[in-house]
A protein has these predicted regions:
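N-terminal secretory signal peptides
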Residues: 1-12, 22-29
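Conserved N-terminal/central alpha/beta ligand/cofactor-binding core
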Residues: 6, 19, 53, 60-62, ...
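Bacterial lipoprotein signal-peptidase II cleavage site
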Residues: 32-45
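Beta1/beta-strand and adjacent pyrophosphate-binding region of the FAD-binding site
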Residues: 67-79
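Conserved beta-strand-loop-beta-strand element in the redox core of flavoprotein oxidoreductases
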Residues: 225-243
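An anion/pyrophosphate-binding glycine-rich loop and adjacent beta-alpha core
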Residues: 287-420
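A glycine-rich dinucleotide-binding beta-alpha-beta segment and adjacent secondary-structure elements
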Residues: 424-508
Length: 538
């Protein structure tokens, strides 16, 4: 049996600590930051913290300051939600600055395919009618009634107006509205070319230019500045050196923690074989800063957009997502294969992907190791559908990156490849084959169409890792997008939006309600802009 106490990571950890010595600290640098000063925001050079931050209870204080900016609102992060917050803030006439950790705006939003809405103008034109209650109750049921239904109702009620607003901003849609590969309702509004980078980010960037919004790029927030329990700014590091942003309110929009192996591991995921599809800049910077000032931790309840990953196989491209070898419904996703864990137990139905694409990998989370087993007949019928597919698999088997894919002439030999118990694995396969022969899965109710016996060699075994697209949640917030402390009281002046502060889901990202994650990006960004404006105005 494999060592279940392994802690090594299968990828190189990104170094987010460059320049941290200027702060007299080493841990926690970063924040997927976001955009630019408005024409009213002021910048000055200074060698010490300004009086607006002095006397506070901030945990980290830089030894020296190279630049000071004063503004009413600071938006930290210029991805999907940060962009919406910035544009809405500009329309509100708010004096603000937006900073961005990366070299360009958009972040993970560039790869999003569509957005949720009900009762939108395009849906009305297409004759699509969906009741808000149907959406809300379906989501609450899938979340075991743990999410706050008022948050879902808020998203539903504002979604149509958000689509109208996006159209007014110049955003581009393909015109297709569907259920996104078998979701529950036709709520998915596809961006032009199926990419938010084309339909959302570029048009919104043009709108930002029109409004005079200039992001402070390559600027990473390090810590929050506190004064008498309220957030009054951020310390950051960027091209201008160590920067102090004084603000009356701060909105965090750093993209979640999907780019942080450490936080994924803390949440219980095995990160030994890990592929980060989304931006590595989404490294939990907002989460870390909020925890430092006493925010309530919702990391145990945060959700993920996660698929399977076999290291030996090529990384799937968005343009080839349906590839039968390594695509979204490929070998790692389940279907006709057999799943076993480190104890050689079959632990669930292998066609959970019929519920949602992410569900199989939540079923695997509690295991130390996960493997899929199949034979040549299964490969030929389901995976090797073309000469190109066969060649890709053959090459992957020969190169065997990560020692994750093997062929053998017997089940017992397969077990040896991963130091599994040969006797119990053979017994598991035998039991499974008997159910396949009867055409009924009496253990987990797997669909009969996928009950294929593993009987004809050669046999194959692959170790399944995880491919992370993004995470959503981690910071406890309320309907106004305000960050809450351990007593569920607001931390004045602090907001978290998008994937940082989402409270829509509990542990499982219910992708079968198509487009809700990005719907929340836009909705929470606009709401935070409006609520922060009201807070600033008193």
């Amino acid at each position: 049996m494999p060592d279940t106490n392994k802690k090594s990571l299968g990828i190189t950890r990104r170094n987010f600590l460059a320049g941290a010595s200027a702060f007299g600290v080493v841990a926690g640098l970063g924040t997927l930051a976001a955009c630019s000063p408005s024409s009213q925001s002021k910048g000055s050079e200074d060698s010490s913290a300004s009086t607006s931050a002095s006397g506070g209870d901030q945990r980290w204080v830089p030894e020296s300051i190279d630049k000071v900016y004063d503004t009413d609102l600071l938006i930290v992060g210029c991805g999907g939600s940060g962009i919406a917050c910035a544009v809405q803030s500009a329309q509100n006439g708010t004096d603000f600055i937006v900073i961005e950790k990366g070299t360009m705006v958009g972040g993970n939003a560039n790869f999003v395919e569509g957005i949720f809405a009900i009762d939108s103008t395009p849906q009305k034109e297409a004759g699509i009618e969906i009741e808000p209650a149907d959406v809300v109750m379906a989501e609450l049921e899938r979340g075991q009634y743990r999410p706050n239904g008022a948050l879902w109702m808020d998203l539903c009620e504002k979604s149509a107006e958000n689509i109208d607003w996006l159209l007014d901003m110049g955003c581009l849609f393909s015109g297709v509205i569907d259920d996104y590969h078998g979701g529950l309702f036709q709520t998915f509004h596809w961006w032009k070319d199926g990419k938010a980078g084309v339909g959302y980010v570029e048009p919104m960037k043009a709108k930002m230019d029109e409004l005079g919004i200039e992001p402070h790029l390559e600027t990473a927030a390090v810590s929050l500045i506190m004064d008498d329990g309220a957030v009054v700014g951020v310390y950051a590091e960027g091209p201008e050196g160590v920067i102090q942003y004084n603000a009356k309110a701060v909105v965090l929009a750093t993209g979640g923690f999907g780019g942080s192996p450490e936080l994924l591991e803390k949440q219980g995921w095995n990160t030994e074989s890990l592929h980060i599809v989304g931006s590595s800049n989404a490294a939990g910077d907002a989460y870390k800063m909020c925890m430092e000032v006493g925010a309530k931790d919702s990391l145990p309840y945060a959700s993920q957009s996660v698929l399977g990953f076999i290291e030996a196989l090529p990384v799937v491209s968005m343009e080839d997502a349906a590839n039968p070898i390594n695509g979204y419904w490929g070998i790692a996703s389940g279907g006709p294969v057999l799943w076993v864990n480190e104890y050689t137990d079959r632990f669930n139905s292998e066609n959970l992907r019929d519920i949602s694409m992410v569900m199989p990998f939540h079923a695997m989370k509690d295991n130390a190791e996960n493997y899929c087993i199949f034979d040549q007949a299964i490969f030929d019928k389901y995976f090797g559908l073309s000469d190109a597919d066969v060649e890709v698999f053959k090459k992957s088997l020969e190169e065997n990156l990560g020692n994750s894919l093997y062929q053998a002439d017997s089940i017992e030999e397969l077990a040896e490849k991963f130091d599994l118990d040969a006797k119990t694995l053979a017994a598991t396969v035998e039991r499974y084959n008997k159910m396949c022969e009867k055409g009924e899965d009496t253990d987990y109710g797997k669909a009969a169409e996928f009950l294929e016996p593993i009987a004809q060699g050669p046999f194959y075994i692959a170790k399944i890792g995880y491919s992370f697209f993004f995470t959503t949640g981690g910071i406890w917030t309320n309907k106004r997008r305000e960050v809450l402390d351990e007593s569920k009281k607001t931390i004045p002046g602090l907001y978290a939006i998008g994937n940082d502060g989402s409270m829509l889901y509990r542990n499982v990202y219910t992708i079968n309600m198509p487009g809700t994650a990005f719907g929340n990006q836009v909705n929470s960004g606009r709401e935070a802009a409006n609520n922060a404006r009201a807070y600033i105005q008193g």
